[in-house]
Amino acid sequence: MRQIDRNFDIQPLQHADMTISLNGQPVTAALGETVLSVIQATGLRQVARNDHGQLVGAYCGMGVCHCCLVQIDGRHKRRACQTLVKPGMQVQTLSNRITETEPTL
């Protein structure tokens, strides 16, 4: 599996402390970095799907707007901007269990 490049870092990543999985592909990360900063470093801008099925990007970056909700290690609706990366973490963007389930009548 090809590793995702971090071409959009503000400053080049000097030392990768770990690898996480982003949408099934490995990407390097540094200790103390947030999930959102890793996502944005790869160039991905639309990170979530809201409860209406629309694609949204991170807005505030500080946990207030809830526009960066992703699935982390199987748990839905985690704020990417408030979650620090951990080795082996599995991150899935554009996932929303509300819009992925079929409505029941």
UniProtKB/Swiss-Prot annotation:
It holds the Pfam family Fer2_4. Residues 16-97 form the 2Fe-2S ferredoxin-type domain. Its main location: membrane. Gene3D superfamilies: 2Fe-2S iron-sulphur cluster binding domain, sarcosine oxidase, alpha subunit, N-terminal domain (3.10.20.440). It is found in: Cell membrane. Its EC number is 1.4.99.5. InterPro entries: 2Fe-2S-bd_N, 2Fe-2S_ferredoxin-like_sf, 2Fe-2S_ferredoxin-type. It catalyses: glycine + 2 A = hydrogen cyanide + 2 AH2 + CO2. [2Fe-2S] cluster binds at C60, C65, C68, C81. The keyword Cell membrane applies. CDD domains: fer2. The keyword Metal-binding applies. Heterotrimer of HcnA, HcnB and HcnC. This is Hydrogen cyanide synthase subunit HcnA. It comes from Pseudomonas protegens (strain DSM 19095 / LMG 27888 / CFBP 6595 / CHA0). The lineage of its organism: Bacteria, Pseudomonadati, Pseudomonadota, Gammaproteobacteria, Pseudomonadales.
